[in-house]
Amino acid sequence: MTATLDVPEQNPDLVLDQSADDYWNHYQLTFALYSVSDRAIPSAYDGLKPGQRRLLYQMHDSKLLPGNKPQKSSKVCSAVTGNLHPHGGASMYGAAALMAADFQRVKVIDGQGAFPRIQGDIPAADRYTEMRLSAPGAALTAELNDHAVPMVPTFDGEWVEPTVLPAQWPVLLCNGAVGIAEGWATKVPAHNPREVMAACRALLKTPNMTDDRLCKLIPGPDWGSGASVVGTAGLREYITTGRGHFTVRGTISVEGKNCIITELPPGVASNTVQDRIRALVESGEMSGVADMSDLTDRRNGLRIVVTAKRGHNAEQIRDQLLALTPLESTFAASLVALDENRVPRWWSVRDLIMAFLQLRDSVVLHRSEYRLEKVTARRHLVAGLMKIHLDIDAAVAVIRGSETVDEARKGLQERFKIDAEQADYVLSLQLRRLTKLDVIELQAEAEKLDAEFAELNDLVTNPESRRKVIDKELVETAKLFKGPEYDRRTVLDFDATPVSRGDEDGSRERKVNTAWRLDDRGVFSDSHGELLTSGLGWAVWSDGRIKFTTGNGLPFKIRDIPVAPDITGLVRSGVLPEGYHLALVTRRGKILRVDPASVNPQGVAGNGVAGVKLAADGDEVIAALPVSCANGEAILSIAEKSWKVTEVADIPVKGRGGAGVAFHPFVKGEDALLAASISKTGYVRGKRAVRPENRAKASIKGSGADVTPAPAE
């Protein structure tokens, strides 16, 4: 038995003569281009994504301006999706809630109700909240009625919408943006609006301004959530090229046994940090945590308290939080935005500011052209009225004596030498208004229109005149950002050292900021996250702690070392000859000579022990040197105006944990050492003028020139 399949006759108009691969590739490409240009990537000019632009336009059209009554969020978002945005209402409300969030650098929407206060907050349902434009938000739409930007039909052709908003401040740089599309992603950090406005004025005046000047005007990001930028690596590259990686750190303060988290890096949610801490405690990686509580509320903001166990240091817990959780992370900036052809590309900070200034020039030009057209038309009508006023009785007689409007129009044109447009305007006036025309008022209006015509004509034809107007308007717009809420929130801690590195799998390792290299004195390091020890080894931190590792050739991860502000040196003490000690030199001119036997070897997970007791006023270890009394070795210490050579034999051997002894008295105007190293006795740049001195004697004043030790003769 043979089965047959009845195939209905197909409409040839519905049949595609195309392979499935070609079909899907075509439609995937179409969707990709759509997601890039109409959803995820903002414009470089007004700094807004299409959904954000449509939301603000709808609010402007609904008169939801500052001072006016706000409208229920569900009604606003429904109007946007119904009239302008062919997508779901949930995504529109999410975008609106983000623009009304407290952690937004500049709040574009004034939200009434439970909108997000910290990153990760979920807003109340749209039926419970209301919204209207804030003052900065209204500045983005203020010139829409001046025909300042192009308008295009909406998706259904029933409305029109602007291709860009006539923004009076650069939204993209001030508020930042994050978006992922097919093949493209943008991640723009927020910046301080005052700094950005100052940079706009500077580039408007000097378009070829140097990068150094730009980096001074905009030294780095400034998020509404606060946090801090650690170090300078990647910042200049980001500002000058639009792409760069830099480290961002949350704010953790120590109060007794508690570590209090009050600020998070951008894009990091509170629950993400708490979940990570719980996982670390459960896995044993953070064994010193006794408790964690979330005391966050809407009045005081973020407050997560992590309590250290008895016998554990809260400072150490703080360091582990920075190293092992997203509280310190790398921000990979990528300034991707759409150009005038709606094509994505990379922009530098300078490029984005110039694009904004180009938008402002276009806005001033188009609104001036629109206003010039209106002024020209009014001047023409006023000129006709002034001719009519020369003999108002004759004009009234012509109008009353005419049987039709056409006859009256022709009569006025012939009698007063005016054109049809002027005659129609006269005929549109009521007779009582026509007879009460005041020549003085007409003359004053004509003079005012003449002056405005000349000014507008100059703006249309002269780019330099538009530049002056743009600068004046930037000054006025900058007044929006005078309040304390626009003070810099993100700390730029350029002198700090990043302590952690995040990998794709979530693991983190310690980073040593300096690339230590192996030399004949045993200083070493490895740039791949491991310290390769041989025998026994020291690791010395700038806060005076030391770690004595065990194992013959045993590598240990930097992640196993408790975090400190910086690692001063790494010394292989196990291979030193008999009689060698470790000298720890502090910035305040003290030295501690320690016998390695005073420190017991520790495993890789050891927390280290006290090395030298530091002064409270910013003291730190600046050098860790293996020293010996043999071979005439001495310590060369260098300050800003002086240097000193101290023989090792004059430095007493002390127990670890002491404050050390003073060995470099400072000359007037000094209070800190710059460096210290091992020197052959009596030689500084080949000069024997620098002699070894007893430890307590004054140092020798120098010129500040290079005084590094010279090779032995």
UniProtKB/Swiss-Prot annotation:
GO cellular component entries: cytoplasm; DNA topoisomerase type II (double strand cut, ATP-hydrolyzing) complex
Catalytic activity: ATP-dependent breakage, passage and rejoining of double-stranded DNA
Sequence segments annotated as region (Disordered): 694-713
Biological process according to GO: DNA topological change
First-level EC class: isomerase
The protein's Enzyme Commission number: 5.6.2.2
Cofactor note: Maximal DNA relaxation at 5.0 mM MgCl(2).
InterPro entries named among the record's database cross-references: GyrA/parC_rep, Gyrase/topoIV_suA_C, Topo_IIA-like_dom_sf, Topo_IIA_A/C_ab, Topo_IIA_A_a_sf, Topo_IIA_dom_A, Type_II_DNA_Topoisomerases
Cofactor: Mg(2+)
UniProt cross-references to Gene3D superfamilies, sorted A to Z: 3.30.1360.40, DNA gyrase/topoisomerase IV, subunit A, C-terminal, Topoisomerase II, domain 5, Topoisomerase, domain 3
Entry keyword Transcription regulation: no
Single Gene Ontology MF annotation: ATP binding
Database matches in PROSITE patterns: TOPO_IIA
Annotated SUPFAM superfamilies: GyrA/ParC C-terminal domain-like, Type II DNA topoisomerase
Entry keywords, A to Z: DNA-binding, Isomerase, Topoisomerase
Domain Topo IIA-type catalytic: 41-504
Function statement: Catalyzes the relaxation of negatively supercoiled DNA in the presence of ATP or dATP but not other nucleotides. Individual subunits have no activity. Not able to negatively supercoil DNA, it can however introduce positive supercoils in DNA. Relaxes positive supercoils in an ATP-dependent manner. Catenates and decatenates DNA. Generates dsDNA breaks in the presence of the quinolone antibiotic ciprofloxacin, showing it is a topoisomerase.
Assigned protein family: Belongs to the type II topoisomerase GyrA/ParC subunit family.
Record text on subunit structure and interactions: A complex of TopoN and TopoM, possibly a heterotetramer.
Protein name: Topoisomerase subunit TopoM
Species of provenance: Mycolicibacterium smegmatis (strain ATCC 700084 / mc(2)155)
Gene name for this UniProt entry: topoM
